[in-house]
UniProtKB/Swiss-Prot annotation:
Residues 121-131 have a biased composition (Basic and acidic residues). Keywords: Nucleus, Phosphoprotein. This is UPF0688 protein C1orf174 homolog. Its main location: nucleus. It comes from Rattus norvegicus (Rat).
């Protein structure tokens, strides 16, 4: 009986050991799995960060290229330099060249000059030379007329300055504005002087008459 009990105890202890070993192995396997999962998550996050950095770098590079392309499109100097330069041609030169080409071929004489390149020549000097009339006096008369007209324009026209006040200051020695009471002064200046009814007398005669009148008054009072 004791041997059976011992064998049963040995068996039970072996079973317990096997169970404990299996539990420890399971725990270690769980720890390993958790560590591997943590490692995988760290690797995944690091890979995501690396991909984000790469995409941001690519985006910045693409942006820089787009900006450069837009600047090259907007820059007007490159467009102007690429265009061919056109040299302006004067119309008179072309007409002179055509006239030279026509002169090589015999053609009837044209009295009218080309339009826009030369002024028509007046025929008055030739007619005057044929008639034998002098041209200098006419030019002198024209110069005198121009001089007289310029002198008349240069002379200032007198402007009548009207005073705004009816009576001037009492302290001033200036006369009253006549235009306020008698109208336009310029019309009065052209009138002839008024003729006096009595003959003019000298100052001495006037004084003598004055003193005589005084003496007569005194005699009458006395």
């Amino acid at each position: 009986m004791r041997s059976r009990k011992l064998t049963g105890g040995v068996r039970s202890s072996a079973r317990l050991r096997a169970r404990s070993c299996s539990s420890t192995s399971l725990a270690s396997a769980g720890d390993i799995a958790s560590s591997t999962s943590a490692k995988t998550t760290c690797l995944a996050s690091s890979s995501h960060k690396a991909t984000d950095r790469r995409t941001s770098k690519k985006f910045k590079y693409d942006k820089g290229h787009l900006l450069k392309a837009e600047l090259q499109k907007v820059d007007p100097k490159s467009d102007i330099s690429s265009l061919p330069k056109v040299v302006p041609v004067a119309p008179c030169e072309n007409k002179f060249a055509e006239d030279g080409a026509e002169a090589a071929v015999p053609a009837p004489e044209n009295t009218a000059p080309p339009q826009g390149c030369s002024k028509p020549v007046s025929e008055e000097p030739s007619v005057k030379a044929e008639e034998g009339l002098p041209t200098a006096p006419r030019s002198a008369a024209a110069a005198q007329e121009t001089h007289d007209s310029s002198a008349s324009q240069a002379e200032p026209v007198p402007v009548l300055q009207m005073d705004s006040s009816v009576f001037l200051d009492d302290d001033s020695n200036q006369p009253m504005p006549v235009s306020r009471f008698f109208g336009n002064v310029e019309l009065m200046q052209d009138l002839p002087p008024a003729s006096s009814s009595c003959p003019s007398m000298s100052r001495r005669e006037f004084r003598k008459m004055h003193f005589r009148a005084k003496d007569d008054d005194e005699d009458a009072e006395g």
